Structures are given as C-alpha cells and as structure tokens.
C-alpha cells in the first residue's frame, strides 16, 4: 500500500511539474504600460488622460517591446473601410494601397471593404498575411445617411462573422491615406483618435451636441477631449457595443425630431466609455 501511495505521489508531483512548465512556456506575460510607453519624451503635448490612458505621439512608445508581446499572442487585426459613389472611385484605391503598405505590417490583417456597387480590388501584391473581403451594401438602404449605413452594416458583419475572425478591429474613413507605420502601439480595448484641429482649442468651445433632448448631448462644462470621426478601434465586442449605443441614440433623436451627427454621437460614447 505504501509503495502504491508513493507511486501516486510521484506521478502527481510529475504532473504538477508538467503543468507548471506548460504555463510558463505558453502563457503570455502581461504587458505593463511603463514597459513601452515613455510620456516624458514629449513634454510639449498631453500624453496621459485624467483616467491614465496613454495619448500616443511619435516618440512616446517603444514598438520593439510591443512587437515582442504581440508576436507571442499571434493576433489578427481587422480593418473595415466603407466607401460609396465617388468616394469609392476617388479615395478607396489609394487608401487600400497605403494601408497594405503601412497598416500592421508583419501581422495577419483582414480588410473588410464595404461598397454600394461592384468594386474591383486594386492590384496589390499578394501576401499570406493579407486578406481582402468585399461586401456590397443593399441599395434599399441608401435613403439613410452615409455614416448610419456604414455603422449599421459593420455591426451586422461583426455579429455574424468578424468577431470570430479578428482580435482587434479598426473602422476607418476612406478619404485618408497612411503616410507612416500604423502598428501595434495603437491596439487596445477601445481606441479613439483626437481631432487634429480641436485638440488645440479650448474645451469650452468644443462642438459637442448641446441640445438636452438629444442622446448625443454633453452638457456645457463637461467633456474632456474632442474625438475625430475618421477612426475608431478596439476589440470587436467593444466596437459592437459602440454601434448599438450609436444606433439607439439615432433612433432616440429621430423620435424627438433631432438629427445629430455621427461625430457627436461618437464623442458622447467616448465621454461615457473612456478610450483606453
């Protein structure tokens, strides 16, 4: 009996050693903000919010540390872009070319391209890390305003398949191009972009929605930053949560005879749900 007990104890101890070794080799070490973010290098700008989220500027982050972390996580990043009419012809091709060159280079990326008509993808050098998926939005929806169609369509695709395909997702406007690397320093649960013009203005002058009956209303004397509408990012779950809140806000405003902009609803969401 003693020999059997001894054998069981030895086997149990050996099993614990195997489990410990597995987790030591496979567990991704949690990344601390101080490991890669160096706000003191840019004393000329705001580098941290009141809720201690980093505000990224060139020179404030160490991409090498982040690369080491995310390589081990084996992530996939999604980039959704929406273009209709002249936007598809004029902006979408240069956007995709620049994104293919600068967006999350070295990582798996799925481009979700949503258009209102047939769109031929530009000639882009094939890569096993790059996947392009085009979706046609039904023409019966075009009585709605553009941003509403974009957001609603994106929400449907997130719920049906995107949330199972990517770890992080960005939604961007097509009328812009990437000039430099847009890398893993931008990843986080909820990511916003400061408005380039309003950043340098007084908070009290921000063009928030001020009508009290609007779902997008931020009362006078409140608010922290003004965010631009060219980009929103985060986990698919958080993007879907924003979309639901935005659509509910639009419905609320329509019932009250109001018509606030997408950007103002976006700012209200980020006012209540702070970017990370």
Swiss-Prot record:
This is Putative glycosyltransferase 6 domain-containing protein 1. Substrate binds at residues 82-87, 173-175, 195-198. Residues 1-6 are cytoplasmic. GO terms for molecular function: glycosyltransferase activity; hexosyltransferase activity. Expressed in both healthy and inflamed gingival tissue samples at similar levels, with higher expression in the gingival connective tissue compared to gingival epithelium. Strongest expression in testis, followed by leukocytes. Keywords: Glycoprotein, Glycosyltransferase, Membrane, Signal-anchor, Transferase, Transmembrane, Transmembrane helix. It is found in: Membrane. The chain crosses the membrane at residues 7-23. Residues 24-276 are lumenal. The active site is at 263 (nucleophile). Its EC number is 2.4.1.-. Binds 1 Mn(2+) ion per subunit. Pfam families: Glyco_transf_6. Its cofactor is Mn(2+). InterPro entries: Glyco_trans_6, Nucleotide-diphossugar_trans. It is a single-pass type II membrane protein. Glycans are attached at residue 74. GO terms for biological process: carbohydrate metabolic process; lipid glycosylation. It comes from the Eukaryota. It is an enzyme of class 2 (transferase). One of its GO terms (cellular component) is Golgi apparatus. Belongs to the glycosyltransferase 6 family. The lineage of its organism: Eukaryota, Metazoa, Chordata, Craniata, Vertebrata.
């Amino acid at each position: 009996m003693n020999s059997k007990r001894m054998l069981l104890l030895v086997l149990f101890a050996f099993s614990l050693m195997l489990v410990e070794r597995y987790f030591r080799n496979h567990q991704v070490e949690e990344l601390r903000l101080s490991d890669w973010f160096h706000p003191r290098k840019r004393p000329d700008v705001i580098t941290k919010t009141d809720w201690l989220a980093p505000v990224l500027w060139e020179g404030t982050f160490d991409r090498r540390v982040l690369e080491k972390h995310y390589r081990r996580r084996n992530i996939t990043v999604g980039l959704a872009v929406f273009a209709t009419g002249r936007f598809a012809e004029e902006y979408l091709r240069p956007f995709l070319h620049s994104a293919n060159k600068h967006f999350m280079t070295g990582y798996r990326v799925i481009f979700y391209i949503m258009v209102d008509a047939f769109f031929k993808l530009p000639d882009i050098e094939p890569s096993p890390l790059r996947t392009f998926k085009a979706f046609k939005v039904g023409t019966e929806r075009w009585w709605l305003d553009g941003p509403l169609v974009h957001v609603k369509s994106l929400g449907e695709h997130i719920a049906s398949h995107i949330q199972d395909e990517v770890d992080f997702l960005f939604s961007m406007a097509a009328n812009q191009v990437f000039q430099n690397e847009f890398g893993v320093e931008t990843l986080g649960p909820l990511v916003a972009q400061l408005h380039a013009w309003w950043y340098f203005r007084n908070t009290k002058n921000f063009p928030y929605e001020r009508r009290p009956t609007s779902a997008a209303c931020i009362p006078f004397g409140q608010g922290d930053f003004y965010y631009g509408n060219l980009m929103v990012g985060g986990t698919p779950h958080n993007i879907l949560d924003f979309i639901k809140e935005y659509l509910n806000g639009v419905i609320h405003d329509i019932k009250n005879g109001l018509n606030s902009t997408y950007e103002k609803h976006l700012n209200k969401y980020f006012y209540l749900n702070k970017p990370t």
